[in-house]
Amino acid sequence: KIDVLAARYLTNTKITCKYLTVELKKDEAEKSTINQILKYVDWVCTEYAYGDYEMIEACIIAAGYEEGMDRYYREVVQRHYTQGSHPVRNKQWNDLKLLKYTCVDGEIVYEDVTPPLR
């Protein structure tokens, strides 16, 4: 099950403009965690975002990440899709952030460790 699924609405409306999917791991995230959240992203895209990946942001928050996660992230994170009909626009989604958390002096500190796609 999705740990966190949030929706952002256009100001003063009930129209959804973005969805945020978050997977939380108290320890180290494994490569399978990326697969897990990408399944959630695909499901949200189909069920809520009308096939528009641009409406979705995703994030994994973990205490650390398994060795080799950078390379695996680059291999699997991108989603290719088509938008519109006249003209058709080919798009690419890769809006998955990897955040590492630590506790410093009783405060939770987040560091963005998302690998660049190059």
Regions from the PLM with identified roles:
Residues 1-118:
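Charged, terminal alpha-helix-loop-beta segments
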